[in-house]
Amino acid sequence: MKLSRTVSYAVRATLQLAQNGSSAPVPCSKLASEGEMPERFLLQILRVLETHGILKSTRGVEGGYSLSRSPEDISLLEVIEAIDGPLETGGEAPPAEQPADVQQLLQTALRQVTDTARKQLESIKLSQLLPPPPLTPTLPPAVPTEKDAVEI
């Protein structure tokens, strides 16, 4: 499955917001520069995501965009369909030399593929696409050396 550039930017921006970890709004300019995306184009995408209830915006000096729900509650399908519209089989099969029953079987098969893809994309949440948090090394307790010993 190939994602459009617009969907790719939408996913990238929502993941940046999810990775931010706070509910503080992030300016579009920061998302654009950190994600290496064109700011004006990204702004249009963010507005669409806001319209679909995926993001919320805050105006003002400290304004920007944030996720409207937790990353565990936003599916990849929601982001894709907010930008590209409903995932579909691609329309009717072109008229061909094939008998009508073959065309019907093909449409049924394509519909099943689309339904499976929709279910898979719905099951993938933004939280699952985030990189794991960095491991913080745990050091063993310090072992006293002769230098540390105090004579009594």
Model-derived features with residue positions:
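Beta-hairpin "wing" of winged helix-turn-helix
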Residues: 53-67
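A short alpha-helical element within helix-turn-helix/winged-helix DNA-binding domains
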Residues: 26-35
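Conserved segment of winged-helix/HTH DNA-binding domains
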Residues: 71-95, 110, 114-115
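Alpha-helical residues within the helix-turn-helix
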Residues: 33, 50-51
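Short, hydrophobic-biased segments on the C-terminal half of alpha helices
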Residues: 14, 46-47
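Key DNA-contact positions within bacterial/archaeal DNA-binding proteins
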Residues: 40
